[in-house]
């Protein structure tokens, strides 16, 4: 780092963490001061990062920028190494913006407000750290740092089954972390030079068996967070029991950490393994899309239906990163950003509805549109974005993934046709379960409208402001996608090109005599789906 350069990223990570440590010293029993303090810290951190990127980030470069590198624990080979590129920068902005809005959404939290605020700020530091660190061991530390806050936020401020949901979350994520750590150590200790530097690890020449095992470990660990079927079962429970602000961060940011890890580590560091796992990722992505959509139909709890919808939509990320195309990669990153805003908006508005009706069961909410017209309008807009209505960000991201897969030369025509057809089935199911959700919650039989909902008790200005801040980028990106894609276009092209460069080496290993049985014999690599066309 240049001696005159401001350590922007270190400041952005340390500031919320240090601010959280100050909270116990603030004299405030009712939490009124804590609200403004937490909002101020989150907003300051967001403004700091926007300023740093605006003044110092060059969109025309793909290498890491705003870099910082200090020896932290030399005995362990651990460096405080930070930097951002086109992949991490927009996700950091997403994380800080959603966390800032979540502090506004949590304005009415009165139970242990100091602890709640402190945990939110610790999570913010961890999220920025995950996206900014360039040391693999430091990445793992940041990854783990957000687990305990999420567990406490669900177990203390959640619903009736909060302990079950929180325990399930921590067990799943802890198990995934074991695989991430195992893969991290395997790569770092291979060869004579022990290093955790991500760029150095990406340059090592690993045996194929080690690369495949490390890839599988990362896939399981990140697959829990994404989540990928069948590692997804913690998500509906966590969402249904978590408070709305926590669900906003969980769906808007934490799920994206899984997608980021798959791109940053699995694709960039292990391209040879990625080309062998890519067909499996396509299959898992399609399963996510269709399974999530089908299970959403059976959910009578509003937040569980939205959780199933998240599982479905995150499947597009898997399909995009396994397409081997620039378009597919572009769509995968855009889907992460788009779903971050859309999911945060939907879970926030479900919380607004819950505060009035005191229920999440859709049949018990039936008929509240006439009492909450503003909430209904905002909820409808977010749902339209989720079902990929043209003019909204969800449409652009999903269409881009479709085009990326259809234009891929890495898969046989038959495989692509089946994959696109099944993905389209999931897309068709989405408006059915979302529109039925709107009908059941806001219309239905008016006589069943909750008695606890006072006439005219609609969304307040603070709540409208939060919803508008989430809906604005959804519409802006939908109308002019380059607002988002400009930040990462060059990076996605670089990553996709790096993976494609490894593909011919793999193609040369395939049987040249057209013996399909011989190809299918390498079942762990699924080569029959790969065509040597690059």
Curated annotation (Swiss-Prot):
The chain crosses the membrane at residues 6-26, 34-54, 87-107, 113-133, 136-156, 169-189, 209-229, 243-263, 277-297, 311-331, 332-352, 376-396, 418-438, 464-484. It is a multi-pass membrane protein. Its main location: membrane. One of its GO terms (molecular function) is NADH dehydrogenase (ubiquinone) activity. It is found in: Cellular thylakoid membrane. Pfam families: Oxidored_q5_N, Proton_antipo_M. It comes from the Bacteria. Keywords: Membrane, NAD, NADP, Plastoquinone, Quinone, Thylakoid, Translocase, Transmembrane, Transmembrane helix. It catalyses: a plastoquinone + NADH + (n+1) H(+)(in) = a plastoquinol + NAD(+) + n H(+)(out); a plastoquinone + NADPH + (n+1) H(+)(in) = a plastoquinol + NADP(+) + n H(+)(out). One of its GO terms (biological process) is electron transport coupled proton transport. The keyword Acyltransferase does not apply. GO terms for cellular component: plasma membrane-derived thylakoid membrane. Its EC number is 7.1.1.-. InterPro entries: NADH4_N, NADH_Q_OxRdtase_chain4, NADH_Q_OxRdtase_chainM/4, NADH_UbQ_OxRdtase, ND/Mrp_TM. Belongs to the complex I subunit 4 family. NCBIfam families: NDH_I_M (TIGR01972), PRK12561.1 (NF009212). HAMAP family: NDH1_NuoM (MF_00491). NDH-1 shuttles electrons from NAD(P)H, via FMN and iron-sulfur (Fe-S) centers, to quinones in the respiratory chain. The immediate electron acceptor for the enzyme in this species is believed to be plastoquinone. Couples the redox reaction to proton translocation (for every two electrons transferred, four hydrogen ions are translocated across the cytoplasmic membrane), and thus conserves the redox energy in a proton gradient. PANTHER family: NAD(P)H-QUINONE OXIDOREDUCTASE CHAIN 4, CHLOROPLASTIC, NADH-UBIQUINONE OXIDOREDUCTASE CHAIN 4. This is NAD(P)H-quinone oxidoreductase chain 4 1. It comes from Picosynechococcus sp. (strain ATCC 27264 / PCC 7002 / PR-6) (Agmenellum quadruplicatum).
């Amino acid at each position: 780092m240049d001696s005159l350069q401001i350590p922007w990223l270190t400041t952005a990570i340390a500031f919320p963490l240090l601010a959280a440590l100050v909270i116990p010293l603030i004299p405030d029993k009712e939490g009124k001061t804590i609200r403004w303090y937490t909002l101020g810290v989150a907003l300051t951190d967001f403004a700091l990062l926007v300023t740093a990127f605006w003044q110092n980030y060059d969109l025309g470069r793909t290498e890491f920028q705003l870099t910082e590198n200090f020896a932290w624990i030399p005995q362990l080979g651990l460096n405080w190494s930070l930097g951002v590129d086109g992949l991490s920068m927009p996700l950091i902005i997403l994380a800080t913006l959603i966390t800032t809005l979540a502090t506004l959404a949590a304005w009415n939290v009165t139970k242990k407000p100091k602890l709640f605020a402190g945990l939110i700020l610790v999570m913010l530091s961890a999220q920025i750290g995950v996206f900014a660190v360039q040391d693999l061991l430091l990445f793992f530390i940041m990854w783990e740092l957000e687990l305990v806050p999420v567990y406490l936020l669900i177990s203390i401020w959640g619903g009736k089954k909060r302990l079950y949901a929180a325990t399930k979350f921590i067990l799943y994520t802890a198990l995934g972390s074991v695989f991430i750590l195992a893969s991290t150590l395997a790569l770092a200790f291979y060869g004579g030079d022990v290093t955790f530097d991500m760029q150095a690890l990406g340059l090592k020449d690993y045996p194929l068996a080690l690369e495949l095992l490390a890839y599988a470990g990362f896939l399981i660990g990140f697959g829990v967070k994404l989540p990928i079927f069948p590692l997804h079962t913690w998500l509906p429970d966590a969402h249904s029991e978590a408070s709305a602000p926590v669900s906003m961060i969980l769906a808007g940011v934490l799920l994206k950490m899984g997608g980021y890890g798959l791109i940053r580590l699995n694709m960039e560091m292990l391209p040879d393994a990625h080309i062998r796992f890519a067909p499996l990722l396509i299959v898992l992505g399609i399963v996510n899309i269709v399974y999530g959509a089908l299970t959403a139909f059976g959910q009578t709890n509003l937040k569980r239906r939205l959780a199933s919808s998240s599982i479905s939509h995150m499947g597009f990320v898997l399909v995009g990163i396994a397409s081997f195309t620039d378009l597919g990669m572009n769509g995968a990153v855009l889907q992460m950003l788009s779903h971050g805003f859309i999911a945060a908006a939907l879970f926030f508005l479900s919380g607004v509805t819950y505060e009035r009706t005191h229920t999440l069961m859709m049949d018990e909410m039936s008929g509240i549109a006439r009492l909450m017209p503003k909430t209904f309008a905002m909820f409808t807009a977010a749902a339209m974005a989720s079902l990929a209505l043209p003019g909204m960000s969800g449409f652009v991201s999903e269409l881009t993934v479709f085009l990326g897969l259809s234009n891929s030369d890495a898969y046989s025509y038959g495989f692509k046709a089946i994959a696109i057809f099944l993905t389209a089935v999931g897309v068709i199911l989405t408006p059915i379960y979302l529109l039925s959700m709107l009908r059941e919650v806001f219309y239905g039989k008016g006589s069943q409208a909750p008695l606890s909902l006072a006439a005219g008790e609609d969304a307040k200005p603070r709540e409208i402001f939060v919803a508008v801040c989430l809906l604005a980028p959804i519409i802006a990106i939908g109308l002019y996608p380059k607002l988002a894609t400009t930040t990462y276009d060059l990076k996605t092209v670089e990553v996709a090109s790096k993976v494609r460069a490894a593909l011919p080496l793999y193609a040369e290993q395939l049987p040249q005599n057209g013996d399909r049985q011989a190809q299918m014999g390498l079942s762990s690599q699924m080569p029959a789906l790969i065509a040597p066309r690059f």
